[in-house]
């Protein structure tokens, strides 16, 4: 499943294609959404927001399309009039004069009013988004030490969208490697330096992934280009200590770590 950085990049692509342009055609596969098609013609997308792995497409008439790709959903941007060759099932089409965005295969799709946005079950449940620039390491530390989360092992906590939205398995693995901790630790057992390091890594690693993953110009990022240090690298030497990276299972997901420098 894509994690927060991948969802945010998808949102950026959708915004770049149709933001601010009048919609010339709108189509929804689900019967309960059909009545919104005519209401959106002539409106435009004001912005595309991410809440962890959910995507909110906001329209100029104050309606918001909620979608969660889960395992199989995918957005595509095409030239208007182009029909991609795919076996996927089309769920949503938002068309402008020159670009069209298409959502395939997703099943979790709703249209929300401003009032419904504030009461939607998933949106109520998720924590702050790690890519939200307003989220600070201080707030991340407060959440780590809160009664709700301080006794949770990191193996499960860093996959829980109620803690911080947008984290997933590769980010969990890379964050814990960055701070030299294993997944069985709890926030209540860390010292001040460890807490500070973890609070920063919880935000820095996802933001670096969003900004630079897939880029090839290392000079632009002064060597800070995001790349996996342990994820999918079992059997290889750890670049920090030379130990051999191992793979196990934690919270029902593959977990990669270095026993030489993660304790």
Curated annotation (Swiss-Prot):
E.C. number: 3.2.2.-, 4.2.99.18
DNA repair listed as a keyword: yes
Pfam family, one: H2TH
Active site annotation, chain numbering: 2-3, 53, 253
Binding annotation for DNA: 70, 125, 169
Functional summary from the UniProt entry: Involved in base excision repair of DNA damaged by oxidation or by mutagenic agents. Acts as a DNA glycosylase that recognizes and removes damaged bases. Has a preference for oxidized pyrimidines, such as thymine glycol, 5,6-dihydrouracil and 5,6-dihydrothymine. Has AP (apurinic/apyrimidinic) lyase activity and introduces nicks in the DNA strand. Cleaves the DNA backbone by beta-delta elimination to generate a single-strand break at the site of the removed base with both 3'- and 5'-phosphates.
Entry similarity comment: Belongs to the FPG family.
Name of the molecule in the record: Endonuclease 8
Gene expressing this chain: nei
């Amino acid at each position: 499943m894509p994690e927060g950085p991948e969802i945010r990049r998808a949102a950026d692509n959708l915004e770049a294609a149709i933001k601010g342009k009048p919609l010339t055609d709108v189509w929804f596969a689900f019967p309960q959404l059909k009545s919104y098609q005519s209401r959106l013609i002539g409106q435009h997308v004001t912005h595309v927001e991410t809440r962890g792995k959910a995507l909110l497409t906001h329209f100029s008439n104050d309606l918001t399309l909620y979608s969660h790709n889960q395992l199989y959903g995918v957005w595509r941007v095409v030239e208007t009039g182009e029909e991609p060759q795919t076996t996927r099932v089309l769920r949503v089409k938002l068309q402008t004069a020159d670009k069209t965005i298409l959502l395939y295969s997703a099943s979790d799709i709703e249209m929300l009013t401003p009032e419904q946005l504030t009461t939607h079950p998933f949106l109520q449940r998720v924590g702050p988004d790690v890519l939200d620039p307003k989220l600070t390491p201080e707030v991340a530390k407060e959440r780590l030490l809160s009664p709700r989360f301080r006794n949770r092992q990191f193996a499960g906590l860093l996959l829980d969208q109620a803690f911080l939205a947008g984290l997933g398995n590769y980010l969990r693995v890379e964050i814990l490697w960055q701070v030299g901790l294993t997944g069985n630790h709890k926030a209540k057992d860390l010292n001040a330096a460890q807490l500070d390091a973890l609070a920063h890594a919880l935000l820095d690693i996802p933001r670096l992934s969003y900004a630079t993953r897939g880029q090839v110009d290392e000079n632009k990022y002064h060597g800070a280009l995001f790349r996996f240090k342990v994820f999918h690298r079992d059997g290889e030497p750890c670049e920090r200590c030379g130990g051999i990276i191992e793979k196990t299972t934690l919270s029902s997901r593959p977990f990669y770590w270095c026993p030489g420098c993660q304790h």
